[in-house]
Amino acid sequence: MSPLGPFGLGTAERGIERDLGNCYKLRSSAGNSFIKRNLVKSGAEYIPKWKVIIGKATSAGAATANKKDGTRKVIATLDILEPNGVCTFSYFVGGAFDDYETAKNCQEYYATKFVRFLLLQCLSSINISRDRFAFVPLQDFSRKWTDEDLYEKYGLNEEEINLIESMIKPMDLGGDE
């Protein structure tokens, strides 16, 4: 897990609209654009990899439960950046991998209710940082992980499972990324 702003780009960085031939793809809170390679100050080890990025701001319902059903989403942004993609200080890299499939498995792991419940236990503000993942165990991302797999692996009983299921909202990752 990287620190916030793994590429040395501030939250105000918006990039440029088109690739001038010497650019990386940029993800900022304003969306996608391009940034000249020489402006990227750090994180060279992540650039050629598939990256799972996590937004530093929690979902609006992280600290307080949804009024309708009492659930929380916790993570607002969870996405995959392809090789030669970078991001601003609004995100950190939750994992960097040589192939898309492994990155997808990592992304789906972070989207599980199990992981988001453990993350919620360390949140005290609207910002997520890597130290907030203190209770989240690392996995082998060569395979997919579901909540059921994790409940079994860590020996959760029915009461513990019901607590997690009642508190954490399902997370829809949308398309492939």
Language model features with spans:
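C-terminal substrate-recognition regions of SAM-dependent nucleic acid methyltransferases
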Residues: 1-163
